[in-house]
Amino acid sequence: MIWAHTDQYVGKILHVNPGHALSLQYHEVKDETIFLLTGEMRFWAGPSADELEEVALGAGEAFRVRPATVHRMEAITEIDILEASTPHLDDVVRIQDRYGR
């Protein structure tokens, strides 16, 4: 759900069910910060798909994803993520996706 969209920023809330994950991806320009509202998740980030570091995040924790950072989020429990980013909604380069996107 997009809750704000201006020429300067976008705010979204993402809901992910346990065991599901977002694409392994990066953004060329988009700069985003995620804040885990509820639940627990695994977050992988690094300079390339071969150099990812795994971090466990719980409710109330945040992480900034700068442009060119390869990343993926996977829900351990049901999660809700608050995302604030620059307004580049189509700036997604998918490296791997479980759902064929």
For each predicted feature, which ranges?
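Glycine- and acidic-residue-biased ligand/ion/polar-headgroup-sensing regions
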Residues: 28-47
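Short acidic-glycine-tyrosine-enriched beta hairpin
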Residues: 47-68
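Double-stranded beta-helix
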Residues: 74-101
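A short glycine-rich, His/Asp/Glu-containing loop-to-beta-strand
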Residues: 1-30
